[in-house]
Amino acid sequence: FYTEVKIMLKGKTVVLGVTGSIAAYKIANLASMLVKQHADVNVIMTHNATNLINPITFETLTGNKCLVDTFDRNFEFNVEHVALAKRADIFMVAPASANVIGKMANGIADDMLTTTILAAKCPKLVSPAMNTNMYENRIVQDNIKKLEQYGFEMIKPAEGYLACGDTGAGKMPEPQTLFNYIMRTIACEKDLAGKNVLITAGATQEKIDPVRFITNHSTGKMGRAIAENCMLRGAHVTLVNASVSVEPP
């Protein structure tokens, strides 16, 4: 999905908020993917996140200063959290710890990340990542629902083996999935919003008799590309896969 060489985020400012979850290291790959699409990527880290991945990693990948300290004076703008919030076309907090989710849900702004997202009016995506018991805790679930009511889009965590040794929900989706969310949100004008599109892709088969059928060598790439484009433009897409050699979007 989105593996072809395209320049779809040129002129867009993407802000990534990285919190103290073990999945923080994966965001380096996401930042690199966004930079390859010519996005202006800015990373804000909590102090806890810096114990898991060095800010220099993000500065090297994005070419921008990684913001951590609210009172750091070594940057261009006078009120950086407000200036960056105004420039942002999209704000993604990933991985989002239970702590930061609670702060955002209750308007607490005590660091660079929470003050900036409080000032942002752009689309805001949040990808929770934590232990299963923490994620399923009623307090955390209430905070997630509250953020959804405030207009945040929550990215459902995957299920699987977690760093703590448990197996269950709470795993941050892979960078490709997060990248897809960003692309669908800001890459194109949503001129197909509200439309339902049905697409067939791949090598279809037409039966001749109980033994034989007519088919073709289609890989499904054309159907996949059309489905991808329609999704980016806001359509609700139903993709019917026949025998294909590519992954569906």
Regions found by a protein language model. Give the residues of each.
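A cross-family phosphate/adenosyl-ligand binding-site feature
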Residues: 4-125, 131-220, 224-249
